[in-house]
Curated annotation (Swiss-Prot):
The keyword Ion transport applies. Induction: Under conditions in which the polar flagellum is not functional. GO terms for cellular component: plasma membrane. Its main location: membrane. InterPro entries: Flag_MotA_CS, Flagellar_motor_stator_MotA, MotA-like, MotA_ExbB_proton_chnl, MotA_N. Keywords: Cell inner membrane, Cell membrane, Chemotaxis, Flagellar rotation, Hydrogen ion transport, Ion transport, Membrane, Transmembrane, Transmembrane helix, Transport. NCBIfam families: MotA1. It is a multi-pass membrane protein. Required for rotation of the flagellar motor. Probable transmembrane proton channel. This is Chemotaxis protein LafT. GO terms for biological process: bacterial-type flagellum-dependent swarming motility; chemotaxis; proton transmembrane transport. It is found in: Cell inner membrane. It holds the Pfam family MotA_ExbB.
Length: 285
């Protein structure tokens, strides 16, 4: 809703102001200029990015526009899942968790928490590191270093689409100038025409510059920024898992290990310790 409000504000202010000053919307509709700018931008994205980055971009763009949903419930489920796994490991040993770790999509434990189970990247992170913990003794410091490196690698990978889109946004004014230069060439070919005809062609050429600047600063630039912020916000779940597992390896009680992870959750959705404790008690009950 917030993003749609932002888009509406941009459209009303930019085009409303243009019309208020006496401009006509029909003059901005220049399909050839749009084709040049959008085609050049799309082509540069395809040339400059491997397929997996483009695929991730196709997933991130609609998710960013849609906005976050059920974040509070997601983190409550995450803490309950970690509590369930670590309590089981403490009471029955990691050997008991082997079947759950190897096939989380079929695990009765993981399937209890559908919001988290849908996040395949996070589930893979949890199972891989539980497997690592089960293989042998590892100091909290060693585990923390490994987890930090893995989280950094995941974040850098997930930020590639937003960075690529940001570079494309920066190039849009240039693509707009490209379209405008093409329009000027057409204008010069009609230089012996009437003043009205020349004015029409010049106006059409300037639309390219207008659309390039508009697309950059009112479109792709804020979208790429929102995508980057979404990735960094989603990485909180990984930080939560990291802090929990490190605290567990440091021999902290399970509840305190879960609380170590809770402290990494964003303030606007972070439950209090009492809320977390009550939720975990209800899940165990």
């Amino acid at each position: 809703m917030q993003k749609f409000l932002g888009v509406l504000t941009i459209l009303v202010c930019v085009f409303g102001g243009y019309m208020w000053a006496g401009g006509k919307l029909g003059a901005i509709w220049q399909p050839a200029e749009f084709l040049i700018i959008i085609g050049a931008a799309a082509g540069s994205l395809i040339i400059g990015n491997p397929p997996h980055v483009l695929k991730e971009m196709r997933q991130q763009v609609p998710a960013t526009i849609k906005g976050p949903t059920e974040e509070y419930e997601y983190y409550m489920e995450l803490m309950a899942l970690l509590n369930n796994l670590l309590e089981t490991a403490r009471s029955r040993g990691f050997k008991f968790l082997d079947s759950h770790i190897e096939a989380p999509e079929q695990s009765s434990i993981f399937l209890m928490y559908p919001l988290v189970s849908e996040d395949h990247r996070l589930i893979s992170f949890i199972t891989d590191n539980l497997r690592l913990m089960a293989m042998g003794q590892m100091s909290p410091h060693e585990l923390e270093g490994l987890l930090e490196q893995e989280i950094e690698a995941i974040q850098n990978e997930l930020l590639l689409p937003s960075r690529s889109l940001q570079r494309t946004a920066e190039a849009l004014p240039g693509f707009g100038i490209l379209a405008a230069v093409g329009g000027i060439i057409i204008t010069m070919q009609a230089i012996d025409g009437s003043i009205a005809l020349i004015g029409y062609h010049v106006a059409a050429a300037l639309v390219g510059t207008f659309i390039g600047i508009f697309g950059c600063y009112c479109g792709l630039d804020p979208l790429s920024n929102a995508m980057a912020q979404r990735v960094k916000r989603n990485m909180t779940a990984f930080e939560c898992v990291r802090a929990t597992l490190v605290a567990y390896v440091a021999k902290k009680p399970t509840l305190l290990a879960i609380d170590a992870g809770r402290k990494h959750i964003q303030l606007d959705i972070k439950p209090t310790f009492n809320q977390m404790e009550k939720w975990l008690a209800e899940q165990e009950g």
